[in-house]
A protein has these predicted regions:
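Loop/turn elements at beta-strand to alpha-helix junctions within RNA-recognition modules
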Residues: 30, 45-48, 68
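General beta-strand recognition
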Residues: 31, 41, 55, 60-62, ...
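C-terminal boundary/linker segments immediately following FHA domains
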Residues: 67, 73-108
Length: 108
């Protein structure tokens, strides 16, 4: 159905943004952390090497704490796992990221 395609488009058109940096969410599983192997690398000692995992399923993005020391906060609430919505504020250590629609809407 077209609804499924629409959800796929929504999932593929999201990004994380912080202080002038943007991170495309171009695959269905994204590791966030300080380690060099992280898909989104945040080189900050307040961020764990393997801090959180972003996954998308049926058009919904979920963030999961994967054993971080400082926790994952969504809109100020400490969570183990949470479904993300547009403009949610994600705090990992001292880093603050916004989950939003991509600013450069490229045609795919």
């Amino acid at each position: 159905r077209s609804a499924t395609k629409n959800w796929d488009w929504v999932a593929n058109s999201m990004e994380l943004a912080e202080q002038g940096m943007t991170y495309d969410l171009g695959c269905d599983e994204i590791l966030i952390g300080r380690h060099a192997s992280a898909d989104i690398r945040l080189p900050d000692l307040s961020v764990s090497r393997y801090h959180a995992m972003l996954t998308v399923s049926n058009g919904r993005w979920t963030i999961t704490d994967i054993g971080s020391k400082s926790g994952v906060f969504v809109n100020g609430n400490l969570v183990h796992e949470a479904v993300l919505h547009e403009n949610d504020i994600i705090k990992l250590g001292n880093r603050r990221l916004v989950f939003r629609k991509r600013r450069d809407e490229r045609v795919r």
